[in-house]
C-alpha cells in the first residue's frame, strides 16, 4: 500500500522527492496546490476504494507523504 501511495504522490507532484523525504511538506515546497489536493483525494478514492470529500480532511492532516500514507492506511482499515 505504501508503494501505491508513493507512486500516486510522485505522479501528482511530478517529483520523486516524495519518495526520498517522507516528511517534506507538499504545499510549502510547491509540489501540491489546492487543485492537486482535490485531485489526490479523487485518485485515492479510485485506487483505494474510499471516498473523502475535501471538507472531511484538512490539508494539514495530509501535508506530507508520511501523513498521506497514515491517512490511507487508516481509511482502508475502516472499510
UniProtKB/Swiss-Prot annotation:
Entry's transmembrane regions: none
Pathway: Cell wall biogenesis; lipoteichoic acid biosynthesis
Lineage, top ranks: Bacteria, Bacillati, Bacillota, Bacilli, Lactobacillales
Originating organism: Abiotrophia defectiva (Streptococcus defectivus)
Keyword field contains Magnesium: no
Protein name: D-alanyl carrier protein
Disulfide bonds: none
Sections of the chain in a coiled coil: none
Chief location bin: cytoplasm
Family annotation (HAMAP family): DltC (MF_00565)
GO biological process, one term: cell wall organization
A single GO cellular-component term on record: cytoplasm
UniProt GO MF annotations: D-alanyl carrier activity
Keyword Cytoplasm: yes
Similarity comment: family membership: Belongs to the DltC family.
NCBIfam families, A to Z: dltC (TIGR01688)
Function comment: Carrier protein involved in the D-alanylation of lipoteichoic acid (LTA). The loading of thioester-linked D-alanine onto DltC is catalyzed by D-alanine--D-alanyl carrier protein ligase DltA. The DltC-carried D-alanyl group is further transferred to cell membrane phosphatidylglycerol (PG) by forming an ester bond, probably catalyzed by DltD. D-alanylation of LTA plays an important role in modulating the properties of the cell wall in Gram-positive bacteria, influencing the net charge of the cell wall.
Keyword field: Cell wall biogenesis/degradation, Cytoplasm, Phosphopantetheine, Phosphoprotein
Residues annotated with O-(pantetheine 4'-phosphoryl)serine modification: 34
Residues covered by the Carrier domain: 1-76
InterPro entries for this protein: ACP-like_sf, DltC, PP-bd_ACP
Protein localization: Cytoplasm
Pfam families, sorted: PP-binding
Entry comment on modification after translation: 4'-phosphopantetheine is transferred from CoA to a specific serine of apo-DCP.
Amino acid at each position: 500500500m505504501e508503494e501505491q501511495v508513493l507512486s500516486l504522490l510522485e505522479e501528482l507532484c511530478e517529483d520523486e522527492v516524495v519518495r526520498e523525504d517522507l516528511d517534506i511538506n507538499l504545499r510549502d515546497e510547491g509540489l501540491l496546490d489546492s487543485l492537486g489536493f482535490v485531485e489526490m483525494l479523487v485518485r485515492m478514492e479510485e485506487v483505494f476504494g474510499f471516498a473523502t470529500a475535501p471538507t472531511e480532511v484538512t490539508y494539514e492532516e495530509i501535508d506530507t507523504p508520511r501523513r498521506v500514507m497514515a491517512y490511507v492506511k487508516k481509511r482502508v482499515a475502516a472499510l
